[in-house]
Amino acid sequence: MLLLLAAALPSLLWDGPPDTAATLRQAGIERIQVPAAQYESWKSAGGLAVEAAHPDGAIQLSSPGVQYRANVASATTTPWLVGNGWRILRNPRGRFIYDAPGAKAALAAAEASCFGADAAVHTDAAGLKPFAEIISMLRAIGPNGPPVADIGFIDDGSPAAGEVINLLVRDNLLVKLVAKPDPAMKLNVAFGSKEFPKEEAGNPPMMAHDIRGHLTDERRSLRIFGSAVVVARLTAAPDGVRVHLLNYAGAERKIDGLRVRVLGRYPKSHVTAAGSPADELLDYSVDTDATEFTIRELKTYAVIDLAR
């Protein structure tokens, strides 16, 4: 079981020389991938599991984070999330490589795990400890169950459809890519259909808003309040669900007082958070059809296991 879990965790892609092994161990790193040309020289490094990297065919992902764009209409700045969840959803069997320096290595590892990616994270010395902390957390919580989705999206593979998927993920609309309408989904979206014509794809935010309107907020399995830089995911568990919260601004600042609403009655909860105190949830309430709570502080990544 431990070997299977290790294989499912994001790995560290490290191109430093073997004399950096002590630095890796001190940071809490236990497993690395190295360029094939360096593999023989790394084999004798004690205290580390070393594999040869095979980057051919891997998809290069962006370093996750937040960019702030000027909003001319309101003379303010609007956060734009640089996230890769939509690309992972489009390539469920793909292999991925992040180039994520410093604290962004933690977010890259969390994003990869949250979306179920087979990923390696290339980082620098400043990223070693943040990466190791996330890996330690992922080992502690164990593997995720299957993702929960409200929307089945029939993807035609076009760039326009990709941008709509990206916006659905950013707006915390739980989407699953399907080849044909899935009766288990609350809403099926056929990109290019009469209801969702391709002509609207010239304005992807409008199409994402239209999809949200068809679903309705009342039927959404998961909603968050209080931040525009947090992406939430939901995975199934044997006796409940697991809520994933990714703060894409986590390399710069934490989020205080994030409110979460999950459809279903879940009187039991357990919080595991990276870079933040694992406090009890605040203002916890279980109503007739939903569970709500506030997480006091979110640094990079938090997982809330809810049970009946």
Residue ranges: model-predicted function:
Residues 278-288:
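Extracellular/luminal ectodomains and secreted, surface-exposed scaffolds of diverse proteins
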